[in-house]
Amino acid sequence: MTTRNTARAAGVFYFITWVSSIVGLIMYGPILNHSEYIFDSISKGHIVTGAFLEIICALGNIGTGLALYPIVRRQSESFALGYVVLRTLEASIIMVGVLPLLALLTLHQDLAQTAGTAGIQSALIAFHNFSFILGPSLVCGVNTMTLAFVLYRSGLVARFIPRLGLFGGALVFFSGTLQLFGAIDQVSKATALMAIPVFAWEISLASFLFFKGFKPGALARLGVPTSARSAEMPELITL
């Protein structure tokens, strides 16, 4: 695989992550926002589809780290590996957060008429919400800043993109911290506003990688031929 195709692959993985995460949230969002929804008009298809899309999002996260590693490691091995690990950690938390959504199906189908299920429902939703704070907020903030820093140093993409990533990553981490301590609500205007920069970072990075690819000058400085094959990927596997 050439470096151009590597960039396209990374861009596709980024597009997959944010499309699947947004559509997934739309699918199961009503269940998280309406306490009685599960007992009245829950749609099994919506929950299963939303959970599936969250898993796709998690796999896309891992894909971005693996796709970028062979190139980014030329600038910093430790930061490149750190990004892979952090993206994998974020993906793991997302997958764990899917489990309580699926458990809501059992609650509705088998225990809907049982006393005390409202408390169980609230606990399952809280489990999912806290996983969203830890993964797509706190861990995402750190891995965003990790990649943005190494991209800024390497010059592999337009300078404004890593600058946006550094700012957006710090802001979403700060937002997650405020949510964790109850200073702001998880679903609020403040939270949405603070998520805009990191959302813009992912769209900008994905678009640049897919349509333009890595900057040839930066690749040359890092000693990466534009026709280099990702035969370097086995080095990742042997780590």
Language model region names:
Residues 1-239:
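Hydrophobic, aromatic-enriched alpha-helical segments typical of multi-pass transmembrane helices
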